[in-house]
């Protein structure tokens, strides 16, 4: 997530060129992009509040894990993350999220999940003017509301309660 801090004119190969000066504070980087090329290189405005709300709703949905090879899915996830589309990034976060009671992720799954979560939290924090930590908390709260995760947690609580009753009767 970068911020345009100015527009400057530079002489390049004898031509005068207007450039956006984009600062990436978290990455400690400054980028200069020719004004006419801004959209073709992927620069865009921040998402609006409606898009953020839809992204958080997407995260609450049921994960869609395709049964294709991991390398193919990883490429698709990477493409969604790099697209910059907040809804597509939310889909990656939803699909790769693992709660405490689920099996662990592979290293590459974890890397993709963290990249998607980072991009999503940066955008939400900028749009809602909150900290990235608060944005991550919002995302994780919505992930916990997912039908699969909520039902599984309730089911496990019911099993534990039944086990406790069985142990009490045996004693």
Residue ranges of predicted features:
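A positional/architectural concept
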Residues: 1-43
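Charge/polar-rich, low-complexity and marginally structured segments
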Residues: 44-171
